Amino acid sequence: MILKLVHCLVALTGLIFAKPYQQQQAVLAPSQDVPLRDIHIGDINFIHTTDTHGWLGSHLSQNDYDADWGDFVAFVDILREKILRQSRDVIVIDTGDKRDGNGLSDATWPPGLRSSEIFNMMDYDLLTLGNHELYTAESAILEYRGTSQSSKFKDKYVCSNVEFIEDDGTRVPFGNKYITFETPIMKQRVLALSFLFSFQRANNRAIVTPPLEEITQKSWFQNMVETNREEEIDLIIVFGHLPATDPTEREMHKIHALIRKYYPNTVIQYFGGHTHIRDFVQLDSKSTCLQSGRFAETVGFLSINMTDPVDAESPIFSRRYIDFNKEAFKYHLSKLGHDSNVPVSTKKGKTISRLVNDLRHELNLNEKLGYIPQTYYVSTRPLNSEENLYHLITHKILPNLIPPKNYEPSMSRFILINTGSVRYDLYKGPFTKDTEYIVMPFNNDWRFITVPLVVASRVETYLNKGPVIASLGIPSSSHHKQHFGGFQKCPFINNPNLSEGYTTEDDFGCHGDDTPHNSQREYDIPNVVQCKEVKKVQEEEADPSKMVHVIFYSFMELDILNAVNSIINDLGLRMENLTTNDCSHYGGDSTKKLLRDYFSQF
């Protein structure tokens, strides 16, 4: 008797070499008995956000991130006032990616239509865009006209290497190429630039020039250095949507090397983003880069003491990653003011919180679609663990993809998805409309191609050895901090009095997080995972030449074809190279819909 074996596999990459570098999520609320680490006020102080992706309404299933945008605005306003009273300067910065990842931004068209208005109620001093502001023409138009050219931010929005295309085809700078200003208290003369990484998937209303090309080939940069000589500038701020640590492209380091040619002795402070991690890099004795996480989990704080009487030639940098919760905000405000009863809310903050809540209800984001009986993790559980989200998808979700009516039922199939289509952990509790936007916001179309089993069985391995498959999902883990020699500088924390949370290692050591947490191990995420259905008791019993279906997301088509043709050639099979003409529409529900249907049973 021929039996159908549903054998759903995930790539085992990273199961052996787990690393406690960047844990993804906190699980429990921090104990009030756990002492937090203070922020240190300098001559110039920075508050930094990045990669918020629409998370303006707090993390409803995670108490460690229970502050909403109104709480954050109130915190910044009060903190700014307290620092200014100490005769020190404050600069508030955001480095882009404000949509794609939460219902508050994504349940409207275009994404960010309503959330941008709330986001912009923060009084940023400097801001720019990320790649998620450029995936569609509608998003680019909204960002350019609603934020970049708004009366509030027109003189504060900087984007040195992106151009916007007007309705008549005219190319104009997306924001200021650079700006100069003087800080109000310390009277520091500041030059600010901003760069987006070499992003090649912009829509037809925007053009991105690679940063190094922009610097070396455009006349504005040379004009800038000629009119802003080193002796006239006290501080350079380079903020943008590119990683602090990037062992492959090293764009930040290359930008720094070029700017250093013109400003060899000036303090240069960088602010990065894109790879969704907490990070701090020292570029030289007068330059560092801060990257402040993602998804309104982190408030980055940095101070520079530029007038140290002992050694004026060596500025003192101090960084802190603040957990995005109300208790942490209250702690830092009370310590700064030496007052445990310091107010932590403002009229403006309460208004913003109400707007966030009203928008959540208007978009029906709390609509319950099912129940999640346990928590599933993206990368802090091994891929073969029943607590891993990809394990759930490949074992419980993808097998429910119903083939079309004309599909041959005896045909074996391999269903592949790119891991970047999953954006976040799935937490125990109600499965709501918002949950869909948070975990798997994108719909997909299924395509398939017919190939011999011997080829299909090698596609997953081939893709997981190749470059990252482009998507709107989590950026490549290849940008995560590299630890040479295979050892960590920081200990793995396992304290029964602590909750799980971020335990960050950076160039300044192991104590940058304001809230001590237990570490979580981080497992590498492969490019793709697959569900394999082979119509034999054992796969090895199947005829390797038997034709099977490889099913995949439509945007993966070129990657699949490249893999299939390379495998065919490597095996020396007598087959013509396959093309898009050999791929067909498969049909069936999207993974997003399959996920919803699965949890609707609970």
Swiss-Prot record:
Q: Which UniProt keywords apply?
A: Glycoprotein, Vacuole
Major place of residence? other
Q: Matching InterPro entries, A to Z?
A: 5'-Nucleotdase_C_sf, 5_nucleotidase/apyrase, Metallo-depent_PP-like, Nucleosidase_C, Pesterase_C1039, YHR202W_N
One matching Pfam family: NadN_nucleosid_C
Query: Which BP terms in the Gene Ontology apply to this protein?
Result: NAD catabolic process
Glycoprotein as a keyword of this entry, yes or no, is yes
| Cellular compartments annotated | Vacuole
| Domain of life where this protein originates | Eukaryota
Post-translational modification note: N-glycosylated.
| GO cellular component terms given for this protein | cytosol; extracellular region; fungal-type vacuole
Q: Which residues are glycosylated?
A: 305, 497, 577
A single Gene Ontology molecular function, please?
5'-nucleotidase activity
**SUPFAM superfamilies of this UniProt entry?**
5'-nucleotidase (syn. UDP-sugar hydrolase), C-terminal domain, Metallo-dependent phosphatases
Name of the featured protein: Uncharacterized protein YHR202W
This protein's species is: Saccharomyces cerevisiae (strain ATCC 204508 / S288c) (Baker's yeast)
